[in-house]
Amino acid sequence: MSRRLLLINGPNLNLLGTREPHIYGSTTLQDVETQAKTQAKELSASIDTFQANSEGAIVDRIHAARGEIDAIIINAGAYTHTSVAIRDALTGVDIPFVEIHITNVHTREAFRHHSFLCDKAEAVICGLGVFGYTAAIEYAAKHIKLRGKASRL
């Protein structure tokens, strides 16, 4: 059975392509999502995409993934550095996830160096630009060991 993936993008990622293109590049979120769907299909997987600027909406989407999704790819944006709620949601649903960042957060401002998610993630990808999404999707589709209900399929 094909893997069911969920790509979550957090606050301000809806502005990709126009927000600080010298940092984040000119690729739009729609471009990222279109490429993700094409890639997932090529890997015999399916992918749902979701973007929200509010923490609660992200938590709700993670909860809704329980029993339906095999792996999550998440770019939590600024919530990476602040959100215990997103961390708790990810650990609570027991779905393996890959944390992703377009930029190398470790070479940026000090407040971006800490992640509330990384110690629970299967993998962390940062600094590869939007290619990081490609790497994360391939990893999630091919290499993550499934857990819970998904692992019994």
From Swiss-Prot:
Give me the reactions it catalyses.
3-dehydroquinate = 3-dehydroshikimate + H2O
Record-linked InterPro entries = DHquinase_II, DHquinase_II_CS, DHquinase_II_sf
**The keyword Ubl conjugation is annotated on this UniProt entry:** no
Q: Name one GO molecular function term.
A: 3-dehydroquinate dehydratase activity
| Cited NCBIfam families | aroQ, PRK05395.1-1, PRK05395.1-2, PRK05395.1-3, PRK05395.1-4
User: What family name appears in the similarity comment?
Assistant: Belongs to the type-II 3-dehydroquinase family.
Protein name, please? Answer: Catabolic 3-dehydroquinase 2
Q: Which organism is it from?
A: Fusarium vanettenii (strain ATCC MYA-4622 / CBS 123669 / FGSC 9596 / NRRL 45880 / 77-13-4) (Fusarium solani subsp. pisi)
Q: Which taxonomic lineage is given here?
A: Eukaryota, Fungi, Dikarya, Ascomycota, Pezizomycotina
